């Protein structure tokens, strides 16, 4: 497994961001019947759903992944994507997950992100793991 876990819908925006990021990552399956377990601490990268409100912002697949105690115990931070058209609620899945899991919300980016987002996340992830213990 890897230190980054992500979910991407069929739009593939988050997947394209992760490909451009170029860091090892594990994808939460789109098919809700497929399950994965993560055996090391990780940062979760997640898109926000819905029309800008908190209800429905976190994808069902991510909820199911985090409802697994084994996976939830290893989350160390969250990065969220979203759409600025949602106003103050853009990227709010990150806020919901950070609050419910008691981890920091590290960054948010719009849609597929910009090169600046890629650079910021790459640098931030490296700094985060240097400062944070990886022990489960």
Swiss-Prot record:
InterPro entries membership: Flavoprotein-like_sf, RNR_Ib_NrdI_bac, RNR_NrdI
Gene Ontology terms, MF aspect: FMN binding
SUPFAM superfamilies to which the protein is assigned, alphabetical: Flavoproteins
Superkingdom of the source species: Bacteria
GO biological process: protein modification process
Family note: Belongs to the NrdI family.
Main function: Probably involved in ribonucleotide reductase function.
Protein name as annotated: Protein NrdI
Organism whose genome encodes this protein: Salmonella typhi
